[in-house]
Amino acid sequence: QDSKEFKDALKACEKTGCLVRQWVEGIRVSVAVLGTGWDAHVLPPIDETKNAPVSLVALSSSDEVAQAIRSEIERCAFEVCLALGLRDFALVRLVWDGAQVRMAEVETLPSFAEGSAFEVACKTAGLSIEGVLNHLVEL
């Protein structure tokens, strides 16, 4: 909030190699992706603020539009993993700003802890985190 404090923080970031990005208003979602390449599977988007499945009502008052937005979120997560050549699993963090999906970051080693976005996504998709982890160990 303080201009000098902000400038000092930016200088500190330059020294340590931190990344500073523009804040984007919107619905923040985490999307777990399992698999590699074209065989990857996208799990249901998780609302980061509630750590629960994204409510279609939050995306749009129209069910048809909300489903199209969810599909776009899932497509974006899939394409990010494909473009980066990620293997086996990842957690893609995105923002729906009301007009488009924006990528925030990708976690190549997300938390599998109970209540984490990855675990909630697995549970929402009908998968147990234990089963997913056993599958990943066997790869």
Predicted regions and their residues:
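Phosphate-binding site of ATP-dependent enzymes
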Residues: 3-75, 80, 96, 101-102
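Short coil/turn linker and secondary-structure boundary residues
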Residues: 1-4, 127
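ATP-dependent carboxylate activation and anion-phosphoryl transfer catalytic cores
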Residues: 64-139
